[in-house]
Amino acid sequence: MSITNTIIINMRRKFKNADEAYNYFLDKIITDGKDFGNTRALFNVGFTLENPLENYIFNKERNWKPDYAEAEWQWYLSGDPNIKKLGQLYGKIPPIWERMADSKGNVMSNYGWQMYRNNQLDYVIAKLRNEKDTRHAAISIYDCKEHKHYRKDTPCTYAIQFTIVDNRLNMAVLMRSNDLWYGFCNDQYCFSMIQKLVADELNMKVGEYYHYAHNLHLYNDKI
């Protein structure tokens, strides 16, 4: 199957929840992915999660840990980029974050730190509250002016955008790169919690979650 055909198929997919999406793309990457560095990847993938708050991954082989995902979400919510905060919340610091941290223990790709930068979250909530049909309710995560800070890790996400449709809050997440095994499982949990946070502030229901990744992949050791 060509990359073009893969794009067309994936852009039309709707899933009830994150677990259904995970299992589908786990098989899809293995069968139709392209070898790309030390991964197998699908390109320009987009899909919809109809029930974003059904955000648990039940795949037994993956052995996803909801307590860790919640700790990571609380870390982001704190706005503190230092891995010591995650250690306090989870009881230990996962080695991957130690590798990504700078000499002071900060991870500048931390979504919470980026989300609160320039009061972006408050701006989004105020914009949606005052103008329901706005197209400006977006949070920028990736910032080219911060390239010098991305020495050990670069944000996988470009931006998060919110739109009110039929009095429900929809959310779109745009990613440059998304590792299905680790990244998607924990990221979708945190993003769905951001969606819920904003919806609660606006006193409305959560709508759909649109997930777009330029490169959705599995590392070779997970294939």
Model feature map: region roles:
Residues 2-223:
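Terminal, non-catalytic protein-protein interaction segments that mediate quaternary/complex assembly
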